[in-house]
From Swiss-Prot:
It is found in: Cytoplasm. PANTHER family: 2-ISOPROPYLMALATE SYNTHASE, PTHR46911. Its main location: cytoplasm. The keyword Transferase applies. This is 2-isopropylmalate synthase. Residues 439-557 are annotated as: Regulatory domain. Pathway: Amino-acid biosynthesis; L-leucine biosynthesis; L-leucine from 3-methyl-2-oxobutanoate: step 1/4. It holds the Pfam family IPMS_D2. It comes from Pseudomonas entomophila (strain L48).
Length: 557
């Protein structure tokens, strides 16, 4: 079978919502929602190999450490393992006073009774009821009309009241999800939820949660936002209801749907860390939280050690986080492109502590989430001088002059093309050594002697020449470099000179950079590093001289 030329024969567009006076497009998110993690329930049930109790407890502790205050821990009536895990959390004291355990149940009395039994002894708990409400489920899965679906929800809601009353020492919060809400007629979704509200009789002081899932993502995020705004406007006793979102990512817009849903009036967001969940996954709570953070809003979740969180999630889920995953992927703070690297390097150079973050291409400071800057710029065949310069500066304290950046980037480019691989900072430094610091032929500086007399500099140098000959050159000038140039056997013109310290204190070294021309040829650069600045400058001159002469010989050959 192939894709249809006319997909309208098989698929139909989801109808738009008639909401001409919608207000959500002009709203902004100004505070974090109530967060609920479903990693241990929705996320766990979607794994090829569900977590064992040890992994579940490790994941639970990570969620608590991050700051998630409502955690859906299991489906206690589904298995003894899930039931026992809830008991472990309660009996062994793993639920902090500021954290609420949430569990899920279907709408059958035996399952509801088992669910409430699993929570015996909990200080507080959210019990989550659901049944599907959309036309396709009513028709295909349950063979129920609207009244039948509504009756299922109402009868189960009454059972919640019954079983909660048997454990009066627990502070109960009831939650209802019209599963497949986003594919359900809005009027009917409201009708069912209003009926549940009447049974549970919430107040502004003791609210219930209405969770409105995009169980399967069926439309663009703006449609979901319209549904949420319509629902918030029309549901009964809105002041006694927490509106919760539970989006999936079937169309790739779960994040956007949740953000627009919050703009449309929702109070709460359910999801999983890094977007695990059925099919294409639940909405990613990490991305949602850090999207808020980068807009200057406290997300009320702490991802200061995001790689530590990722490690736990990957090991428990046995699923890798994609290298391009927002904020946490291995490559998301990495630039290979030359123009990107140059902009980032300049941004870091100008960024001051305490100022608004404005480094190009980096929407978040990697340090805020526990990332180092080492992987921000990496060098491959697409890289330019900015990335190379940044790595040398950060790792080795070497600040190449601008024109030398251009020259050396061509050397690196040739090497990456030859290797067909990325180059590390160490490899780049070794290439710098080979190309410049070890450029000792045809002339190698052995020693030098400098005397100052009557404002003039006198230089004597011992040089190892070709064929292991020893040469002695003498020169005089207004400074050490000018004196050395005067003593050279070839005509040399210094075009540019730069120097700086590497490190500080007794271990500091000097780096010198020279750009020169030999006999009117093209400019060539040299580098010298030494504890003594004069020696470093002499080494830089010999580096450039030898490179120029070697290039001339190669061209002549």
């Amino acid at each position: 079978m192939t894709m249809l030329k006319d997909p309208s024969k098989k698929y139909r567009a989801f109808p738009t919502i008639d909401l001409p006076d919608r207000t959500w497009p002009s709203k902004t998110i100004t505070q974090a929602p109530i967060w609920c993690s479903s990693d241990l329930r929705d996320g766990n049930q979607s794994l090829i190999e569900p977590m064992d109790s040890e992994k579940k407890l490790r994941f639970w502790k990570t969620l608590v450490q991050v700051g998630v205050k409502e955690i859906e821990a299991s489906f206690p009536s589904a298995s003894q393992t899930d039931f026992d895990f809830v008991r472990t959390l309660i009996e062994d004291g793993h639920i902090p006073d500021d954290t609420t355990i949430q569990v899920l149940t279907q709408a059958r009395e035996d399952l509801i009774a088992r669910t409430f039994e699993s929570l015996r002894g909990a200080k507080k708990a959210i019990v989550h009821l659901y049944n599907a409400t959309c036309p396709s489920f009513r028709r295909i899965v349950f063979n129920q009309d609207k009244q039948g679906v509504k009756d299922i929800a109402v009868n189960a809601a009454k059972l919640f009241v019954k079983y909660a009353a048997q454990q009066p020492d627990t502070h109960w919060t009831f939650q209802y999800s019209p599963e497949t809400f986003s594919a359900t007629e809005l009027e009917f979704a409201k009708e069912v939820c209003d009926a549940v509200i009447e049974v549970w009789n919430p107040t502004p002081e003791h609210k219930i949660i209405l969770n409105l899932p995009a169980t399967v993502e069926v439309a663009t995020p703006n449609v979901y936002a319209d549904q949420i705004e319509w629902f918030c406007r029309n549901i009964n006793r809105r002041d006694s209801v927490i509106i919760s979102l539970h989006t999936h990512n079937d169309r790739g817009t779960g994040i956007a749907a949740t953000e627009l849903g919050l703009m449309a009036g929702a109070d709460r967001a359910e999801g999983c860390l890094f977007g695990n969940g059925e099919r294409t996954g639940n909405v990613d709570l990490v991305t949602l939280a850090l999207n808020l953070y980068t807009q200057g809003i406290d997300p009320q979740l702490d991802f200061s050690d995001i790689d530590g969180v990722r490690k736990v999630v990957e090991e428990c889920n046995q699923l890798p986080v994609h290298p391009r995953h927002p904020y946490v992927g291995d490559l998301v703070h990495t630039a290979f492109s030359g123009s990107h690297q140059d902009a980032i390097r300049k941004g870091f150079a100008k960024q001051q502590e305490g100022e608004l973050w404005e480094v190009p291409y980096l929407p978040i400071d990697p340090a805020d989430i526990g990332r180092s800057y080492e992987a921000v710029i990496r060098v491959n065949s697409q890289s330019g001088k900015g990335g190379i310069t940044y790595l040398l500066e950060q790792e080795y304290g070497i600040s190449l002059p601008r024109r030398m950046q251009i020259e050396f980037s061509q050397v690196v480019q040739g090497e990456t093309d030859r290797l067909g691989l990325e180059m590390t900072a160490e490899q780049i430094y070794k290439l710098l050594q080979k190309e410049y610091l070890q450029a000792n032929a045809p002339y190698a500086l052995v020693s030098h002697r400098l005397q100052e007399e009557n404002g003039s500099s006198h230089v004597q140098v011992e040089v190892s020449g070709e064929g292991e000959t020893t040469l002695h050159w003498h020169g005089k000038g207004n400074g050490a470099l000018e004196a050395l140039v005067a003593g050279l056997p070839v005509n040399v013109e210094i075009m540019d000179y730069n120097e700086h310290a590497i490190g500080a204190g007794t271990n500091a070294k000097a780096a010198a950079y020279i750009e020169l021309r030999v006999a009117g040829g093209r400019p060539v650069h040299g580098v010298g590093i030494d504890e003594n600045i004069t020696t470093a400058s002499f080494k830089a001159l010999f580096s450039a001289l030898n490179r120029s002469l070697s290039q001339q010989q190669a061209k002549a050959a």
